[in-house]
């Protein structure tokens, strides 16, 4: 007999296995083993006629959730049940947060072990931590389970109640979510502010001066004793000067005249000032600050940051990555201070060990901050990590070490200079002692380079000095609208407002991008027309559900449930039932919402009407007695739609496409058109005989008005054959694809090898030599998988059989068939002969068409002890007809659970 330890993932299982005695068997649940039904297909036959069946929550019987085992988890559950037969003790070692507690609880309810059960928790996977956790097991925390379950039910109630309303009133397949919709509204509000923003222009002067051959710069501050205007002096809604501002506003002509008046006049230093100051290091990372800094420094999305951090945690490199605590254990503080002393010297160590306190709204679970694992921190270049894993680990290491370093000491320098009636100011900064800057500068990837950039050197100057003015320049400025949210700034705002939980931000941002509410534009989150329509409807009819304050108070209630301060059932009843509950609100407003109004979007500074149609957004404008409509290209957002763009779309609709010229070889006309996916060139007209003329999209950044005949001919000739690869003898071509221009090497049976073009590369002019350089570079991104090992060719089709490393461990791949390595096999021991039967078994199992019923448990409201299964929920028998369309996006916002 053995002791069965259950964790979430195979990677975590492999790492933990190294630290446990021989008689411990570690298995993975692969995440949650039960959940609410994801679709009508998963609802068991016994419940399909219930009015609440599609909701998956029996609101008539104490909000009893209907839990099912997803089809993808049935094999896992069966394997765990088999492993349980040989166990004399079960240890549930899932993560130490609400989701982890919930997974353990579900495993307990599902497996119903007859042997002793323990709950083991840890926040890092090291030998010391695992052994300590093993000696300090506890029971399942029912309050944490209630909090997770309440959050899950809330997300389902909001998603499944509001989403169908959006389908009826705006467009099929839309979704609403408890946190998702608030995030979308923030992004839409920012875009509205940008559209309403009125730009104001103003000018100032910049002087290049010299003292004892040492150059420095100064900026005009006052004229005739009155302060010069800057951007903060203007009203963002009108562009006019704010009424209480007593400032001088220069236009271009006045700035030029002032420059000419001051040129050649003597300058004098009238005041100097030095202000000493300190810069303190930032606290170690929480989930949200890690996401923000990884996005700023490394350009990694919140979703990818969490994926990489999860891997680092499961492999024992960092502590648990879902936390809002900035606290460090005494051992961690000691480890960080040892690193400082060894690498930078004692003078860079803070005089006393530093501890930090969490200031974010609603901070909860008592984890540590994210830091390198263990009592001795591994130096990044000695970990053996590569690529993103190394970059993220190094970021965490630097931040943790820096938090125990001495403050940086700086001096702010200010020199006031006068010429005629104008006063200029030269500002400088001197770093007297770099302190923690030596290891970490927030927002910078290179501390040494950042250190140089931090300093602004001024020559020694004193009152009465007369520096030489070498040049005066006029500088024009325009006030800027508020910046669009990036992933980093949205995460920061969500956390500061107390909306959602840091552990859910990555999935929320991923969801709003995947659902088409937001597009990424140069790291900025740009809302789509659909986002505007949905937010307008929710603001008008369900304002609480998109209000940050209301959503923040919901989070506080969930936190209170987690510590037993608030009862979960009364809270759910108050939210959903009764006259003011969500269920009744939706019923009442369903008849009040006019689809024609819901589909219309009002945009600042735009006379044309924008509407959401069956095939996407379009513009509508009256022209005499007619109403002209024109589709809006899919990649065009409200940010891009202005009166000029509207005129272009309407002109194309009424007058037909612009003609670039005649193709020199075919004699056919070449047109430029704008379609649902943006502008493209077309060879010839679409006729009955030629229904699909040759078309090619314009490369990103190329405007329709900039297209020449030569460029159009080149685009229509794509793909270009560049020549043969010197090693394979196969063709290399250049072309345009969904993700932009690329080159491709056709390797025959080995598939096609793609590389994106870079920088100044032009798909129309790239040479074979340059293509070979690109192909020689290692692949990047999602499709860049290089086999760990090539096992050989499959005897049936001579296609390669390879080993790859995926998120759940090493697997075998042949064509489209993937097979996991069986227990006991490793990358070194697996052979082609062993792989073939595994692939055959996997391929055979994929051909089965019989479908088993979903295993279900309808959970009641009473929970006795953690070892007992929950009661089966019952409900009054009613029949509700529902139409299910497979293509609709699921309204469930399970990704928001956290």
Swiss-Prot record:
Its EC number is 5.6.2.1. Residues 840-898 are annotated as: Disordered. Residues 2-126 form the Toprim domain. Residues 867-877 have a biased composition (Low complexity). It comes from the Bacteria. The record marks 32, 151-152, 155, 160, 167, 322, 515 as: Interaction with DNA. It is an enzyme of class 5 (isomerase). PROSITE patterns: TOPO_IA_1, TOPO_IA_2, TOPRIM. Residues 141-583 form the Topo IA-type catalytic domain. Monomer. PANTHER family: DNA TOPOISOMERASE (PTHR42785:SF1), DNA TOPOISOMERASE, TYPE IA, CORE (PTHR42785). This is DNA topoisomerase 1. It comes from Synechocystis sp. (strain ATCC 27184 / PCC 6803 / Kazusa). The gene is topA.
